[in-house]
Amino acid sequence: MELEKNERINALFAFYQPLLTAKQNDYLQLYYADDYSLGEIATEFSVSRQAVYDNIKRTEKILEGYEQKLHLYAEFEARNQQADRIRDYVLSHYPTDQTLRDLIDGMENLEAK
């Protein structure tokens, strides 16, 4: 459960990072991406562990709020699932059609940007 939550927060952070303050960015980057402890972050910024914890929890709620309103991550996931289904279908029904493969690769490369 905790791993799923961490993965979700990291994904939301990737989508909505520009909307966060510098402090929110720093704390989440250190906590989730760089695996710092609350104490290490607190020491780094000369604040209490509780202040770091409160900021991280508040920022998690902000990220979830952005996702509830904008759905960027959910739509990204849906597009990726659909692209996977298309790729699987093409590979199983048209394995020698290089044009179809190239089109799918192009679509997937657009999504990766």
Swiss-Prot record:
Gene3D superfamilies: Winged helix-like DNA-binding domain superfamily/Winged helix DNA-binding domain
Transmembrane segments: none
Entries under InterPro entries matching the protein: RNA_pol_sigma_r3/r4-like, UPF0122, UPF0122_fam_protein, WH-like_DNA-bd_sf
A Pfam family matched in the record: UPF0122
Function: Might take part in the signal recognition particle (SRP) pathway. This is inferred from the conservation of its genetic proximity to ftsY/ffh. May be a regulatory protein.
Family: Belongs to the UPF0122 family.
This protein's name: UPF0122 protein LAF_1235
